[in-house]
Design a protein with these regions (language model features):
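Histidine-centered nuclease catalytic patch
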Residues: 6-38
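Polybasic, low-complexity binding patches
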Residues: 33-38, 46-86
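Long, charge-rich low-complexity segments
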Residues: 87-91
């Protein structure tokens, strides 16, 4: 059986992944989540900047749910045109 294919798109923003890939737990590990999904580093930092682990566990464990928050919707609109390895400080 061949190894699984490398991920190609970010779980959050759906842009192609670049060289650096981080793995996000949609349900945080501290809340017994085991599944991981590939994300850009900037997307990963933004998730954890905007949401607590409790919020991620209870209400925001899908990209669609995350995008319902206005701050995340603005981020997703802004990041959509950036290249895969785009990096900027997360404030």
């Amino acid at each position: 059986m061949p190894p699984p294919a490398a991920p190609t798109d970010c779980w959050l923003c759906a842009r192609p992944l670049g060289v650096r890939i981080e793995w996000h737990h949609p349900i945080p590990k501290s809340r017994k989540g085991r599944e991981t999904v590939p994300v850009h580093p900037i997307c990963h930092r933004t998730i954890h900047k905007l949401f607590t682990n409790k919020e991620l566990e209870r209400n925001f464990h899908t990209p669609e749910k995350l995008a319902e928050r206005p701050e995340m919707a603005r981020f997703l609109q802004w990041i959509a045109s950036k290249p895969p390895d785009f990096h900027a400080p997360t404030r």
